[in-house]
Each structure stands twice: as structure tokens, then as C-alpha cells.
Amino acid sequence: MISLFKCLILCVVFWLVCASTSIASDYQPVPGVVDLRSTFSDGAYDINSLVRLARSKGIQVLFINDHDLMAMEYGIWPLRNLIRKREERNSILKMGADKYIREIERVSQANPDMIIIPGSETTPFYHWTGSPFQGKLTAHNHEKRILIIGLENPSDYENLPILHNHHSVRISRDNLPGVFFLAAAFLAGLVMLWWKGPFRIAGVVVMVLSVVLMANSNPFNKSPFDPYHGDRGSAPYQLLIDYVAARGGMTFWNYPETKSGVRQLGPIMVSTRPYPEALLESRGYTGFASLYGESITVTEPNGIWDMVLNEYCRGLRERPPWGIATADFHREGESGEILGNYQTVFYVKEKKKAEILKAMRDGRMYAVQGRFPQVPVMDEFSVSSADMTVKGISGEDVSLTGHPKIKIMLSSSKPLAGQVKVRLIRSGSLVHSVEGTLPLQIEYDDAYFKPGEKIYYRMDMRGAGIIVSNPIFVNFVK
């Protein structure tokens, strides 16, 4: 009888361990590439060609992020919207948002084994300093950019609250008071035409001025801002973030530490300084580019990412920001880059579009950079209880009654030569590091436990490639 009881206990323990370990094994990794350009803006390939190229490399998920609008304007005061110079290149809005969405749908239907997700790269705002007459005209923050992901309604693009967006005939709410005032003035002038003497002349003047000012007010512009009144802080970007969120889309700050934003561009200067502080100043965005073609510092221990994540843990933010890899892919071989060097790997239960989007929204993914096809792989990053009955992966919350146990397993898709350094970070503090060669397995028991506290763990790997994980949150309970 005692032996039977022991057997039952062992079976229960075995079931609990298997159940907990299956939390991670229930998910399958699906590689994707974010931040692709097509011929709808400044990319070299049409969407169908991008799909064929990705399939040949085993990449199953593509995020098309063409520029929604590539335009700059400078107008002469006081009629800046009438006496102006405008430069515009190919973009979603210039080519047609409806055409863009329909083409993605057509290619998706023709390639059911691939997942193609629409989006855009956007520049909500920039501002001018200097003068065109003195040769020192400078556009500031024109390359301070946000990726939009998951919007599938053409009207959502046509009404984006960004500068110079006149691609919808719908008058924005912010412009209605001015439109009503000028319309009333025009009607008053029309009435004055029936009067005699100087009143009739005044009526003509009022009507002409009303029409001119109405045209100059640009009532179809979707942004309440203009580029002539200096820096407006985070307001234009927060407006865009909130607009996209209200329509079910996601937003990611792109290239927050850009090194190429200051240069001569034809007769003008463009000046976009690194903007990592945007991660702190804005709210409600989904994440940011934690890995791209430049060195960055925001992911360093106790850097800006950790500051924002700790704000979330303290209840000062509604959601944490997730990290993704952004490819900025325009052409195979351009600047030495090829499709597949920068990937975001999603953990999903089924390879479906809705599952990919949910994994992205929930942070169940990691960013990786290699030299395709030699790409490092994060086989496991998990936090569990000591007895393995509770276990979580990136993007998840776990509640623990004791010390956390962290497990990291790394390998590579093809043999990789060279050393790697793996760092484990707890709430901004570097708590453990290991150097070695791939494949590599790390198990670390963290002697940290404070009931009532919320913390997180994240890891990165550098050397023979780069991996940046998303955080796993831990709630300590008694």
C-alpha cells in the first residue's frame, strides 16, 4: 500500500514537471523579418519578389513597412500653404493606400504558406530652422521614425496624423472651427454684394480673402502641427501612437540611436540626432528596434530600456515596451546587408497571422542578427520555480514563492566560429555572465526573493552574432 502511495506521488510530481516544461515546448519558433521596403516606396523589389526571396531563405513571415508618405514642404510666410516648394517621392499614400493593401492581400492569397503583414514607416513631424535665402535651411527630426504594424484599412493610412498628409478629402476635426469661421465670412461677403457703394467692394474683398485663407489653412491636412513653429516635443509622436492604437495597430520606435541623421540633402541640411529619450517621453507604444544596423546603448544594463521596464514594474506604465530587430531592407547586398541578417523570431502555437500579431503584441519573441545563413538561435530562455512547476518565457508573467531558476539554451542554424558572451540582466542589473562557444546551455539559480516585488529578467548574447531577448516578468508572492 505504501509503495502504491509513493508511486502515485511520483506520478503527480512527474506530471507537474512535464506540464510546466510544456509551457515553452507548446510554442514553435517562427522567424520573420520586420521593416521591408517595396516598390511602393524606395525598395528595389515588388512585394511578390520579396516573398520569393524570403521563401528561398526559409523566412516565413514578412512585415512590409513602406514609407506612408515621403514629402517635405517649405512655404513663404504669410501664405505658406500656397506659395511653397514641395518635394515628394514614392510612398503608400502617393501610390494609393487602397492599391497597397489590395496588393498585399493578392500576394498573400497567392502564397498561402507565407504570412505577409502590412504596415508603414512614418515621420509624424519635423520642423524648420534657418532660411532658404541665407543657405542655412535645416529640417530637424525628419528621420525620427516610427514603424506602424497591422493596419489593414486603407482609410487608416489616408487619415494618419502626419505632416503634409492631404490624401483624404475629409476635413480633420481640429480644422473645423477655422473652416466654419471662414465659410461664415465668405457668406457674409456674399450678402454684402447685394448692398450698394463701398459695402459691395468690401464684400468682394471679404470673399476673396476668405477663399485665399481657406486654401492657405489647408483644411484637409491631418496633423494639427506645422513645421514652422519649432520643436513640439513628444506631442506629434504621441498623437500618432494613440491614433494607431485606437485602430488596433502597433507602433515601434525605429532606429532610436541613428548615426546617419545629420547630412547635406541637396540644397538643405537634415538633422536628426539620436532620440533614445523618446522611449521615456512617449507612452502606449508597443516597442522599439532593439537590434538594427548600428550600435545602440539603450539595451545596455541599467540603460533607457531598463528605466522604462522598471517604470512598468512599479505601476507607472500600462504596458512594457518590447524589442524587435528591424532590417531596413531595400535591396539584396545593399550596404553589405542581405535579407535574413536581421530577424525577429516569434513563439506561436500555430503559424497563423493572428498568432504572429499576438506574439508581437505580447512580447513572445526575440531579436537576432547574424550573417545569413549563419544565425544564432535562442532555443530556450525561461524563468521557473525551483521545482519547475511554474515556468514562463519572454513576454510572460510568472508568480513565484521562492528563488527563480533561469535557463538559457543557445545554438546556431549553421556552425558559428568564435566566442560569445551571454549576459543575464535582472531589472537593469547584470547578475550573471558566461563566455563560451555555441551551442551553450546555462542554468542559474538566482538567490533573490522579495515578496510583493515585481521584477524581470532579460538576456543578450554578443560575439558570433547578436541575440536580444524580451523580458520575463516575475511577481514574488509569499
Per-segment meaning from a language model:
Residues 55-56, 245, 281:
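Non-catalytic positions within long, well-ordered alpha-helices that form the structural scaffold/packing
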Residues 50-68:
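Catalytic domains of carbohydrate-active enzymes, especially glycoside hydrolases
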Residues 2, 23-29, 41, 47-51, ...:
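C-terminal functional module detector
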Residues 270-296, 345-355:
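Structural recognition of alpha->loop->beta junctions
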Residues 32-36, 61-67, 91-95, 117-120, ...:
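Active-site neighborhood of phospho(di)ester-bond hydrolases with catalytic His/Asp-centered motifs
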Residues 30-37, 77-87:
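Acidic/histidine-rich, surface-exposed loop or edge segments in extracytoplasmic proteins
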Residues 7-19:
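Bacterial N-terminal signal peptides
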Residues 83-91, 97-278, 430:
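Extended substrate/RNA-proximal surfaces in nucleic-acid metabolism proteins
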